[in-house]
Amino acid sequence: MTVPLTCEYCSKLCNAYAQLGARGVSILFASGDGGVSGSQSSSCSKFVPTFPSGCPYLTSVGATQGVNPETAADFSSGGFSNYFGIPDFQSSAVSTYLSALGSTNSGKYNASGRGYPDVSTQGVNFEIVVDGSVEGVDGTSCASPTFASIIALVNDRLIAAGKSPLGFLNPFLYSDGVAALNDITSGSNPGCNTNGFPAKKGWDPVTGLGTPDFAKLLTAVGL
């Protein structure tokens, strides 16, 4: 379902997420499951970014699949916000990606917008229980709580060591945290009669900075 959003409404929500982050709360959201098409038909002419993933004050999580190699899940939404500009913490990462992308998909997205997702993790072949029956599901709504649970474990260790929780994650992820993420360089998120955005070395609008390594995250936060 597509819900029309105003810039004012999006800004109010985004500012609320920023306030939570300042209070030590880490906000994570699924990037979406429509590839670059977002919630519209795959025959679209322009990419549609999802919200709230476009808000720079939360951490957007995309989906991957497989092991050795781990690749982008083709349904994983990603792109560039039409409401929010590129934040300072990711300006270098986005600039590097856009330079490598060149003219591919030119005119179909806002090259001046905040890029998402920030990170990713496995989002395929999850099992859930519905009315007592086990079902298999895929989606970034599987990936986001998985990444969030890892951050919860890191915060638990930090608090036990007498330190503050991570709170707003993105400045950390795009700096010291990069060393604790597995860079995903294969796959894409098709839509709008295109191959979407390709995963590349470094940040990309399919898998973000990559998938988490718990042990390396502990090292990155000084534990």
Model-found features: residue ranges?
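Extracellular protease catalytic domains of secreted zymogens
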Residues: M1-L223
